[in-house]
Curated annotation (Swiss-Prot):
It comes from Methanosarcina mazei (strain ATCC BAA-159 / DSM 3647 / Goe1 / Go1 / JCM 11833 / OCM 88). One of its GO terms (biological process) is DNA alkylation repair. The lineage of its organism: Archaea, Methanobacteriati, Methanobacteriota, Stenosarchaea group, Methanomicrobia. SUPFAM superfamilies: Methylated DNA-protein cysteine methyltransferase domain (SSF53155), Methylated DNA-protein cysteine methyltransferase, C-terminal domain (SSF46767). Involved in the cellular defense against the biological effects of O6-methylguanine (O6-MeG) and O4-methylthymine (O4-MeT) in DNA. Repairs the methylated nucleobase in DNA by stoichiometrically transferring the methyl group to a cysteine residue in the enzyme. This is a suicide reaction: the enzyme is irreversibly inactivated. Its EC number is 2.1.1.63. The active site is at C126. GO terms for molecular function: methylated-DNA-[protein]-cysteine S-methyltransferase activity. This is Methylated-DNA--protein-cysteine methyltransferase. The keyword RNA-binding does not apply. Belongs to the MGMT family. It catalyses: a 6-O-methyl-2'-deoxyguanosine in DNA + L-cysteinyl-[protein] = S-methyl-L-cysteinyl-[protein] + a 2'-deoxyguanosine in DNA; a 4-O-methyl-thymidine in DNA + L-cysteinyl-[protein] = a thymidine in DNA + S-methyl-L-cysteinyl-[protein].
Length: 158
């Protein structure tokens, strides 16, 4: 598995993946505490394209990513993550709407758990999922990041 850490406007980001695609995009709130497995190999060039796309996203020039993804999860989780990728930049959906989208309308809590386990933040945009009351709810990386990303997208659409 290859990895590379890039800078972002909010926190450093750990990218990890292999020839199958990107497996992880994780915000490092404290880079010093990042636990990189010993068998992972630093490879900046491997992540050049995704790094360029993330830079364009943060600068407001990119709204849709074109990155080969290889997240690891259950079939249910993968169906949720696929549905998340259909939410346009600058828009939000509720957990219930995602549950209906994957044709499992009662599974809104399970959708929330799948969101929480999303290994590829930003590109699989779990930050675009909000509570039924319109409020920001759970985000594995922290509500500060969720709020930052939603405001970034809102401002970039103006």
């Amino acid at each position: 598995m290859y990895y590379h850490i890039i800078k972002s406007p909010i926190y450093p980001i750990l990218l990890a993946g292999d020839e199958k695609g990107l497996k992880h995009l994780i915000f490092l709130k404290d880079e010093r505490k990042a636990k990189i497995p010993n068998d992972w190999v630093e490879n900046k060039d491997f992540f050049r394209e995704v790094s360029n796309q993330l830079e364009a996203y943060f600068s407001g020039k990119l709204k849709t990513f074109d990155v080969k993804l290889a997240p690891q999860g259950t079939e249910f989780q993968k169906s949720v993550w696929k549905a998340l990728c259909e939410i346009p930049c600058g828009e939000t959906r509720t957990y219930g709407e995602i549950a209906k989208r994957i044709q499992n309308p009662k599974a809104y809590r399970a959708v929330g758990l799948a969101n929480n386990r999303n290994p590829i933040a930003i590109i699989v945009p779990c930050h675009r999922v909000i509570g039924a009351n319109g409020k920001l709810t759970g985000y594995a990386s922290g509500l500060d990041i969720k709020e930052f990303l939603l405001k970034l997208e809102e401002n970039n659409l103006k």
